[in-house]
Amino acid sequence: MANYFNTLNLRNQLAQLGKCRFMAREEFADEASYLKGKKVVIVGCGAQGLNQGLNMRDSGLDIAYALRAEAIAEKRASWRKATENGFKVGTYEELIPQADLVVNLTPDKQHTSVVQAVQPLMKDGAALGYSHGFNIVEVGEQVRKDVTVVMVAPKCPGTEVREEYKRGFGVPTLIAVHPENDPKGEGMAIAKAWAAATGGHRAGVLESSFVAEVKSDLMGEQTILCGMLQAGSLLCFDKLVAEGTDAAYAEKLIQFGWETITEALKQGGITLMMDRLSNPAKVRAYALSEQLKTIMAPLFQKHMDDIISGEFSSGMMADWANDDKKLLGWREETGKTAFETAAQFEGKIGEQDYFDQGVVMIAMVKAGVELAFETMVAAGIVEESAYYESLHELPLIANTIARKRLYEMNVVISDTAEYGNYLFSYAAVPLLQEFMTTLQAGDLGKQAQTSTSVDNAQLRDVNEAIRHHDIETVGRKLRGYMTDMKRIAVAG
């Protein structure tokens, strides 16, 4: 198999990278009805598998789980989760031949073996679904020509897919049909019904392509969504402790700070996040973010280049073949960091204190979001896709850190995201060491800002620059669709 994207000519590469259409609410008037009365079999019962299945069942679909025979015989976690939630469970041989839609929600590294196992069992004209297109785009999986191949990609971890659905809402979602596999022309109808069944139509759906989803998803998770949060956590914690802050207090400020800061980001973009600061702190955060963008731009560009070329995926797949030696080593090292092992502060930190004491954290968020967005758009990815893969998903990832620090983030995200996170953070931490030595009183921690005055013209220019960045323009439009957004922060 060859990397699918690299087999396309330049015109097709650009066309697929740039495919993105915001779908109107009216297009989902039938909700999940196209799949009602049909059999949907999910392969895999991890975070996405279980939670999408719960939503789809609650939306009236017939859901069952196909698991490997040994997982059933040994009553592994996947079997327990499916059976404890009242789902029908069977082997591939028992369930796949009856399925109208087979949804592959196993980890990326298992996709090739899973798809090769289920394809011979699928009935003629059935559909195969993914929630991430890595197997199709990067691995180059070849699927039978009578099989329709679709994707529904919720833009958040599986746990949040369920939580937002239970709140009566949903999460923004990308849907796509693989152009090489739509023999009956029903791919879009299947994808729309599946997206509606998960609740995604209530938060906004983009019609995209497998290529655009994969390339933008990899870029977002490696840089701002996971890599920047991990690098920022380690750098800021070490800086606070080195300057005399109690380690437990520093840990809590960082652990819950990202979530509190990005809740403002979710509700009102970078503009609202920056507006939570005093005017002197806002001007300072803006200056810090501009410095960070200059320092980090080449790193962001390298990640985008390696994703587009396939260099990233080939390196990760080589690690798969080596029993995840790099991934597991990086995971172990992260677990031993001072931030991860620090005691928990039992006192309360006020909501505004997270902003006032986290000026450089806000600068990191602003710089990372804007750089990820700008770098994706420069590579041919449409602004709406770049927004969802940089700004919108960030509060959901920050929420995982608030639960159990970096450990929880890396457990919840995919192995693909985790591998990319380590690549970025291991490069970003040394890259930003010198920058961290230039921080002033008031940039991080309890020390007061050294300046309490602001030049009116400078403040005006800063506000204009913040509010008129392209990500703020597209963000205002997309957030207008999400009128039912629910607050998720749990900071204490």
Curated annotation (Swiss-Prot):
PROSITE patterns: KARI_C, KARI_N. It catalyses: (2R)-2,3-dihydroxy-3-methylbutanoate + NADP(+) = (2S)-2-acetolactate + NADPH + H(+); (2R,3R)-2,3-dihydroxy-3-methylpentanoate + NADP(+) = (S)-2-ethyl-2-hydroxy-3-oxobutanoate + NADPH + H(+). Residues 15-208 form the KARI N-terminal Rossmann domain. Gene3D superfamilies: N-(1-d-carboxylethyl)-l-norvaline Dehydrogenase, domain 2 (1.10.1040.10), NAD(P)-binding Rossmann-like Domain (3.40.50.720). Signal peptide: none annotated. Coiled coil: none annotated. One of its GO terms (biological process) is isoleucine biosynthetic process. GO terms for cellular component: cytosol. It holds the Pfam family KARI_C. This is Ketol-acid reductoisomerase (NADP(+)). The gene is ilvC.
